[in-house]
């Protein structure tokens, strides 16, 4: 999911940069699909194509998930990955549009490969990223073998993750997107499940984890409650109405919320008669009351090293030397988690 326009209103004053180690002892509910997309887009071979095993199966997501999760465990973080379930009906049209966009990008990839344009291959390949049900199943298998808990959400993963954070079972939600704030997570941690370095043009920038607190966002934007934040996001555009209200940018949307107080009042006045492909009040209702489950666990268990070796080395052709070294790191990280105080969770 993504509410990028809302992110433009969240200034530096509410983005608290921290070191990874400062999150030691914290349980963080990670948006699994968001993380997998990041891995598939960023972990590439020099020609722009994803990592693959001998059978031609993509393994970028497994490589990213395996090594990045070990990094989190070494920092003392207790990750819980939350997977998307069935999307709401009003999201299906947007999902179809994204599928078409990815297909067009893939056509550009094939054309660039044929014409030998290596830079364009890398550029379009990132836009053509897709996640299959097989990739999801493989990710769940990998996490299970690692002893890392995962949760199957009934609907949106970020809604489930936010619910777990609101209940106090996780300290925060980890995602690059801001939707978890709309779903009510008290805290959002960005830049957790991504590479610590990112190339923008010719420049390589360092990405450090940043904490964004819901209450701090509301204060900074002078909003009374989460409902007003949801109203603001709907005006700007969400996954369910990506275009928002035409002609309404971040500052104008904020002023409208300040002046009229709610989306309902706006629909009765300045937006009366405006066309919306999706009923904005249905979107608001979903953000306030999404389907969630109480069937989840957050405890990190001992890894099954034999199963991990079989899965990564024999099934997917990972380097035996690299996997063995990583398993040693995983073993030590698990040992540290066992001895850490439970008080740090709170």
From Swiss-Prot:
Residues 1-102 are annotated as: N-domain. GO terms for molecular function: 5'-3' exonuclease activity; 5'-flap endonuclease activity; DNA binding; magnesium ion binding. Its cofactor is Mg(2+). InterPro entries: 5-3_exonuclease, 5-3_exonuclease_C_sf, Flap_endonuc, Flap_endonuc_arc, HhH2, PIN-like_dom_sf, XPG-I_dom, XPG/Rad2. Mg(2+) 2 binds at residues 177, 179, 239. Binds 2 magnesium ions per subunit. They probably participate in the reaction catalyzed by the enzyme. May bind an additional third magnesium ion after substrate binding. Residues 120-261 are annotated as: I-domain. Mg(2+) 1 binds at residues 31, 84, 156, 158. Its EC number is 3.1.-.-. Keywords: DNA damage, DNA repair, DNA replication, Endonuclease, Exonuclease, Hydrolase, Magnesium, Metal-binding, Nuclease. One of its GO terms (biological process) is DNA replication, removal of RNA primer. Pfam families: XPG_I, XPG_N. Disulfide bonds: none annotated. Interacts with PCNA. PCNA stimulates the nuclease activity without altering cleavage specificity. Belongs to the XPG/RAD2 endonuclease family. FEN1 subfamily. NCBIfam families: fen_arch. Structure-specific nuclease with 5'-flap endonuclease and 5'-3' exonuclease activities involved in DNA replication and repair. During DNA replication, cleaves the 5'-overhanging flap structure that is generated by displacement synthesis when DNA polymerase encounters the 5'-end of a downstream Okazaki fragment. Binds the unpaired 3'-DNA end and kinks the DNA to facilitate 5' cleavage specificity. Cleaves one nucleotide into the double-stranded DNA from the junction in flap DNA, leaving a nick for ligation. Also involved in the base excision repair (BER) pathway. This is Flap endonuclease 1. It comes from Pyrobaculum aerophilum (strain ATCC 51768 / DSM 7523 / JCM 9630 / CIP 104966 / NBRC 100827 / IM2). The lineage of its organism: Archaea, Thermoproteota, Thermoprotei, Thermoproteales, Thermoproteaceae.
């Amino acid at each position: 999911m993504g509410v990028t326009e809302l992110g433009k209103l969240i200034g530096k004053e509410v983005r608290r940069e921290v070191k990874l180690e400062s999150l030691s002892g914290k349980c963080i509910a990670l948006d699994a699909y968001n993380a997998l997309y990041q891995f598939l887009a960023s972990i590439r071979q020099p020609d722009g194509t994803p990592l693959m095993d001998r059978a031609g199966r993509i393994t970028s997501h497994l490589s990213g998930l395996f090594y990045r999760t070990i990094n989190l465990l070494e920092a003392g973080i207790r990750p819980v990955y939350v997977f998307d379930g069935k999307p709401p009906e009003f999201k299906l049209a947007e999902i179809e549009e994204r599928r078409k966009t990815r297909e067009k990008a893939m056509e550009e990839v094939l054309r660039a490969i044929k014409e030998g344009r290596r830079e364009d291959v890398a550029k379009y390949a990132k836009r053509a990223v897709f996640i299959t049900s097989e990739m999801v199943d493989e990710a769940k298998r990998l996490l299970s073998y690692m002893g890392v808990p995962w949760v199957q959400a009934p609907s949106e993963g970020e809604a489930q993750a936010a619910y777990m954070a609101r209940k106090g079972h996780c300290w925060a939600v980890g995602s690059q997107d801001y939707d978890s704030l709309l779903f009510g997570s008290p805290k959002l941690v960005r830049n957790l499940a991504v590479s610590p370095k990112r190339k923008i043009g010719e420049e390589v920038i360092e990405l450090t984890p940043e904490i964004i607190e819901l209450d701090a966002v509301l204060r900074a934007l002078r909003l009374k409650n989460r409902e007003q934040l949801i109203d603001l996001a709907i005006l700007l555009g969400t996954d369910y109405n990506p275009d928002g209200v035409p002609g309404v940018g971040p500052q104008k949307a904020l002023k409208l919320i300040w002046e009229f107080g709610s989306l309902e009042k706006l629909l009765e006045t300045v937006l009366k008669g405006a066309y919306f492909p999706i009923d904005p009040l249905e979107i608001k209702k979903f953000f306030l009351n999404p389907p969630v489950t109480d069937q989840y666990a957050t405890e990190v268990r001992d890894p099954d090293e034999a199963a991990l070796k079989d899965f990564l080395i024999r099934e997917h052709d990972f380097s035996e030397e690299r996997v063995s070294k990583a398993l040693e790191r995983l073993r030590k990280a698990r040992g540290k988690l066992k001895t850490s105080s439970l008080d740090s969770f709170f």
